From Swiss-Prot:
Coiled coil: none annotated. Residues 1-31 are annotated as: Disordered. InterPro entries: Catalase, Catalase_AS, Catalase_clade2, Catalase_clade2_helical, Catalase_core, Catalase_haem_BS, Catalase_immune_responsive, Catalase_large_C. Heme binds at Y375. Either KatA or KatC is absolutely required for the protection of the nitrogen fixation process. Induction: A threefold increase of the activity arises after exposure to heat stress (37 degrees Celsius), to sodium chloride or ethanol for one hour. Not inducible by hydrogen peroxide. The active site is at H88, N161. The keyword Ubl conjugation does not apply. CDD domains: catalase_clade_2, GATase1_catalase. The keyword Metal-binding applies. This is Catalase C. Keywords: Heme, Hydrogen peroxide, Iron, Metal-binding, Oxidoreductase, Peroxidase, Plasmid. GO terms for biological process: hydrogen peroxide catabolic process; response to oxidative stress.
Length: 705
């Protein structure tokens, strides 16, 4: 009988710094299950002896096909990915709850709006629209703001954006607008950018997009944080009460920490320094217990009120200004828990506009009607089965029963004889006319036509209203964004066509962009189906700066410190930051930290090369007189100061930092936003002052686009 071969000896002890393991014949490490450590198994439950080597014929021979552990592991890896969303592919999800402020029984029979103080579980996914799953966070783009509320009457999905209007009026154009903004099909670039010919060619031939373009070219499209942006339901919906009386409703999420965005040059640099900037910001806020909140506001109106407008309330490219119809707070959304597994929850969550509880109904908005089909249809391809509602993140949290059965990956399988109704066996579930969803019996009439209502035809008036509602800095940013985007368009006639549209919105804006693009002669204003109204008043609610915060709460201060930094001043700054409910990070030449003047050794959060000032809402310079002589020769230190100044941020500095201000080229430009810090009182005053966030009066002098 042949001698039984012995297994290779993989039990030589090895230590890698703090980790104990064993070393195999080839020098590879093996971590062995001991004590209470779980044993690694296959997906079938079989324990695994060696997860570092495949089965071979001899130590240098071919891999054997009988190695079922290898085959299972590679098989699963090869099929890990699912198709990414065709839009909103890059997203970030957070758990929380919705709390009702007061009963809305007069308007809706939806259960979650009946009892003040009642909390309902919620899941929110924030996203960009155009970029792929691996794109950067701070693209100039619309942000998705999709909320799934697990009510006692089923899931309610309010699938919104951070902009209250959209590019198109009819869902049949949705493939076209998305195709145009995605990478061009013959070259597969640019990624997560609208600055290319296809997008602007489509927009320039789609006048209904002009209002949306004003929003996307504004600072709304480059938010500082998910926590500092509004959300909108976009469409007009209906509330329906127990008497089957209908009230039109528009939904608004308003952040309690106020609105805030970045500037374009800052966004570009943030994307290079931290492509996950928005994700990291949300993660850090939740982990530190600073749970972001939004108030849910509604605009409520009836048909008589709607009939007073020159535009159509079914048009998703229009808003009802808050000054015309004030919003009413009806509840709050609090986000307080991160997902336990990104794929299982954030990636597999399925939002559908059709998911509404009894008491909330649809309008005839043609974009909403199309979304109701598309958002259901897309889940089959992406999640692979009609049973995507079996996934825990998508399943209702209320009791549910139905006769839908079988299909791929069915995880909820009913038992018993009955799988249909009506049936004779006395078994449910049964329909309930009283509790069930009842569509509002609106009267409809007219022939079948492929035609758009004339009430949808005014494409420029609200675009103009948005522009004139902005402060001068915000208007500059819109003009600069249009100039930048159109400068990337290679086809001159497309640029000229867009300028012709801009002249209809605001003549000064159109000429400014045209001159910046180098047009020798201005085109004629584009033909308009309806002339631009000049009598619409500015709406301050449309401005970020006018709706910005009053405090530094929720923001982050970057403190650049070196060996010998003033320890007392640093302690005072940290105390002031914490009192303001803000955050801070210490940046030092080395991540190992620095020794303050009082002898304390303090660890840094970031090394200077990895912590540029673009990552912070305001900065403080705390070098020592000795260390600053070396710091002034470091390019990243000079950039830290110059960028903060150019981006109109507040800069606090100790007296020893003056040489750094000089080398950064701003010593002769100091203004009310550059503040010397000397003691605890000045530190506290600085934290109060920086609640304004930006010194916009500085912007014309820095001439930074």
């Amino acid at each position: 009988m042949a001698k039984k071969p012995s297994a290779p000896n993989n039990t030589k002890p090895a230590t890698i710094h703090d980790q104990k393991a064993t070393r195999g014949n080839g020098g590879e490490l093996h971590q062995i299950a001991e004590g209470d450590t779980p044993v690694l198994t296959t997906a079938q439950g079989g324990p695994v002896a060696d997860d570092q080597n495949s089965l071979r014929a001899g130590e240098r021979g071919p891999t054997l096909i009988e190695d079922f552990h290898f085959r299972e592991k590679i098989f699963h890896f090869d099929h890990e990915r699912i198709p990414e969303r065709v839009v909103h592919a890059r997203g970030y999800g957070v758990h929380g709850f919705f709390e009702t402020y007061e009963s809305l029984a007069a308007y809706t029979r939806a259960d979650l709006f009946q009892r003040p103080g009642e909390r309902t579980p919620a899941f929110v996914r924030f996203s960009t629209v155009a970029g792929s799953k691996g794109s950067f966070d701070l693209a100039r783009d619309v942000r998705g703001f999709a909320v799934k509320i697990y009510t006692k009457e089923g899931n309610w999905d309010l699938v919104g954006n951070n902009i209250p209007v959209f590019f198109i009026q009819d869902a049949i154009k949705f493939p076209d607008v998305i195709h145009s903004v995605k990478p061009e099909p013959d070259r597969e670039f640019p990624q997560a950018q609208s600055a290319h010919d296809n997008f602007w060619d489509f927009i320039s031939l789609t006048p209904e997009s002009m209002h949306m373009i004003m929003w996307v070219m504004s600072d709304r499209a480059i938010p500082r944080s998910f926590r500092f942006m509004e959300g909108f339901g976009v469409h007009t919906f209906r509330f329906v009460n127990a008497k089957d009386e209908s009230t039109f409703v528009k939904f608004h999420w308003k952040p309690k920490l106020g609105l805030q965005s970045v500037v374009w040059n800052e966004a570009v640099k943030i994307n290079g320094a931290d492509p996950d900037f928005h994700r990291r910001d949300m993660w850090q806020a939740i982990q530190s217990g600073n749970f972001p909140e939004w108030d849910l506001h509604v605009q409520l109106f009836d048909q008589d009120f709607a009939d007073k407008f020159d535009f159509d309330i079914l048009d998703p490219t229009k808003i009802i200004p808050e000054e015309v119809l004030p919003t009413k707070p009806v509840g709050r959304l609090v986000l307080d828990r991160m997902p336990e597994n990104f794929f299982a929850e954030t990636e597999q969550v399925a939002f559908m506009t059709q998911n509404v509880p009894p008491g909330i109904d649809f309008s005839d908005d043609p974009l909403l009607q199309g979304r109701n089909f598309s958002y259901l249809d897309t889940q089959l391809k992406r999640l692979g089965s009609p049973n995507f509602t079996h996934l825990p993140i998508n399943a209702p949290k209320c009791p549910f029963q139905h006769f839908q059965q079988d299909g791929h990956m069915a995880m909820r399988n009913p038992v018993g004889r009955v799988n249909y109704q009506p049936n004779s066996w006395g078994e449910g579930p049964r329909e309930s006319p009283m509790k069930g969803f009842r569509h509002f019996p609106s009267e409809e009439q007219g022939p079948k036509l492929r035609i758009r209502a004339e009430s949808f035809a005014d494409h420029y008036s609200q675009a103009r209203q948005f522009f004139i509602s902005q402060t001068p800095p915000e208007q500059r940013h819109i003009a600069d964004a249009l100039t930048f985007e159109l400068s990337k368009v290679e086809t001159p006639v497309i640029r000229e066509r867009m300028v012709a549209h801009l002249l209809n919105i605001d003549e000064t804006l159109g000429k400014k962009v045209g001159h910046a693009l180098g047009l020798e002669t201005m085109p004629k204003p584009a033909d308009a189906a309806v002339a631009t109204r000049q009598d619409l008043d500015p709406s301050p609610a449309l401005s970020i700066i006018q709706r910005g915060p009053k405090r530094f709460e929720g923001r982050k201060l970057g403190i650049l410190a070196t060996d010998g930094a003033d320890g007392a001043l640093l302690d005072a700054l940290i105390a002031a930051v914490e009192k303001e409910k803000a955050a801070f990070e210490l940046i030092a030449p080395k991540v190992g930290g620095f020794t303050a003047s009082d002898g304390k050794r303090i660890a840094a959060h970031q090394m200077l090369d990895g912590g540029p000032s673009v990552l912070y809402d305001a900065v403080v310079l705390l070098p020592s007189a000795e260390a600053v002589t070396d710091l002034i020769d470091v390019a990243t230190a000079r950039d830290f100061v110059a960028d903060a100044f150019a981006h109109c941020k507040y800069i606090g500095y100790a007296g020893a930092a003056v040489p750094l201000l000089e080398r950064a080229g701003i010593a002769e430009l100091l203004d009310e936003g550059t503040i010397e810090l000397t003691d605890a009182a000045s530190a506290a005053a600085f934290l109060t002052e920086i609640g304004k966030l930006r010194v916009w009066g500085r912007e014309p002098s820095v001439k930074l686009k």
